[in-house]
Amino acid sequence: MKTTTVACAVAGLLFSCVSGAPDPVHVEIQQRALPNAPDGYTPSTVGCPASRPTIRSAASLSPNETSWLETRRGKTTSAMKDFFNHVKIQDFDAAGYIDRHSSNSSDLPNIGIAVSGGGYRALMNGAGAIKAFDSRTPNSTSAGQLGGLLQSATYLSGLSGGSWLVGSIYINNFTTISALQTHQKGTVWQFQNSIFEGPDGGSIQILDSATYYRDISNAVSGKSDAGYPTSITDYWGRALSYQMINATNGGPSYTWSSIALTDAFQKAEMPMPLVVADGRYPGELLISSNATVYEFNPWEFGTFDPTVFGFAPLEYLGTKFNGGSVPSNESCVRGFDNVGFVMGTSSTLFNQFLLQINSTALPDWLKSVFTDILKDIGENDEDIAQYAPNPFYHFSNTTNPSAAELELDLVDGGEDLQNIPLHPLIQPERHVDVIFAVDSSADTTYSWPNGTALVATYERSLNSSGIANGTSFPAIPDQNTFVNKGLNTRPTFFGCNSSNTTGPSPLIVYLPNYPYTAYSNFSTFQPDYTEQERDSTILNGYDVVTMGNSTRDGNWSTCVGCAILSRSLERTNTNVPEICKQCFQRYCWDGSLNSTTPAGYEPVTILDSAASGIIPSISTVAMAVVFAAWTIF
């Protein structure tokens, strides 16, 4: 997530709200990802396989991804036919179109979904979007609904808070959002128990918290004692895991690479999950548009950027690669790619949560315990994740700024302002046609998005340094235009006319956070949420992507179908249906600008009234007063 007005954001820690939402369906979560790390959170030395791991060039997709895509295409083809059985396009048989072109998969739509950063706000708003897109959600396949879009997608990417959502879904059985919205104590997504408190274990909370801190400390100490550098990101990642993966012990043995070993993923029954982080070069403090953008997929860790242009086998992170191979006198390492550490890496800005321990209401003795845990961690390492040994050591020596470094430093995936994880989805090798970009960024004074993330990705594509490596992205207007023209108040399509882009580029369906039934603009740094706040924010996220169950536009689901088909219709030289032309007229950015400074952006709910995360009318002075009172307390 991005760094914006931290003082104001921290002040927002105080604001909570009570808002109504239907009870989620209670579904038992069954763990599917494999707890396959040899020694819990501690990376372990193992024998290398007969074919020793190597770093490969990013000139193509990996053989694993290529093979998986062949299987996934069959699943998405079937899912799209189901989707278009309830998403109707007037005077056009969309399901029949998919069926007629199913023998040539390159003709068919290729869909990506990207969930932005923004802390718990992004997780919950993004969860509402995924809930709306999931055909397993009750009533999501009714008229005007978008259920089945998730099943039709090839890729699902997350960044920072969005990575918590993606990780939580995939490690918990590619489960439904309804199942994660449990009301049972001691389970996942119990955000009323903050990171500082830990899960409710059924005892006195102080005792539960003491056990929680001790277990986190022991896990990180095990990694440190094994010779691996640790930072606050390790503690942050372990704490996250209790909320996102396993409330009992935080799932210390679950790895990101284990997703690729599960039967359901090998059968391509779900989209491919991708998590994004930024590289921080030696001696660098600020992350620029030239930063290398790394991805974690189920098989690999690496980047398409020309600086490194390589991928390492994820399962063997922690192994001492040198020049792209493992020296004959070195063993391999497994267990470094802990799920919590991966999610923590993508959200290192939230290390600030842990640094606020003295401002919490926890007993002094617990504060002292946790302060002792953190005392040996230098201030300069507060916001990084340390990947040592550096997998790209002496790899791409002429272009890789970290090639001579024994340690690779990674930071929050939104620190370069690209707060929507579009980077993996716009790579030409992946041939994505349309990206549904869910934006929960806190760009404005009151924590609403204004298109900054899209602007950053567009500007990067034009960067004269060549960091974009030939990737193309649709033209995006400036942030003032977003606000002045209301492009951040409703869905907007970018890249509708593919002939206007410099190269193959997906159509972007921009889905900005907006108050339909709840003020979902919570401060990025608010650490806890009532169950009502959680559920109402998820419900609002559902409304964001369905436009209030199509109440703002009765043809919205049809227009989504048109966006999905757009690039495919071009490839097959199929006439665009008249209703789709009307959709594009309504939702495509027309290229006009209004860059004058806008008035303050304070949207209000447009359906049922609700309480808010940050009340639009509250003044900055009032926020400062409350913040001062909180710090004194």
Curated annotation (Swiss-Prot):
CDD domains: cPLA2_Fungal_PLB (cd07203). Catalyzes the release of fatty acids from lysophospholipids. It catalyses: a 1-acyl-sn-glycero-3-phosphocholine + H2O = sn-glycerol 3-phosphocholine + a fatty acid + H(+). A lipid is attached at S609 (GPI-like-anchor amidated serine). One of its GO terms (biological process) is glycerophospholipid catabolic process. It is found in: Cell membrane. Glycans are attached at residues 64, 104, 139, 173, 246, 290, 329, 358, 397, 450, 463, 469, 497, 500, 521, 549, 555, 594. Transmembrane segments: none annotated. InterPro entries: Acyl_Trfase/lysoPLipase, LysoPLipase_cat_dom. The keyword Mitochondrion does not apply. The lineage of its organism: Eukaryota, Fungi, Dikarya, Ascomycota, Pezizomycotina. Induction: Induced by lecithin. Belongs to the lysophospholipase family. Residues 47-594 form the PLA2c domain. This is Lysophospholipase 1. Keywords: Cell membrane, Glycoprotein, GPI-anchor, Hydrolase, Lipid degradation, Lipid metabolism, Lipoprotein, Membrane, Signal. The GPI-like anchor contains a phosphoceramide lipid group. Changing S498N: In strain: ATCC 90240 / AF-10. Its EC number is 3.1.1.5. Pfam families: PLA2_B. GO terms for molecular function: lysophospholipase activity; phospholipase A2 activity. GO terms for cellular component: cytosol; endoplasmic reticulum; plasma membrane; side of membrane. It is a lipid-anchor; GPI-anchor. The keyword Membrane applies.
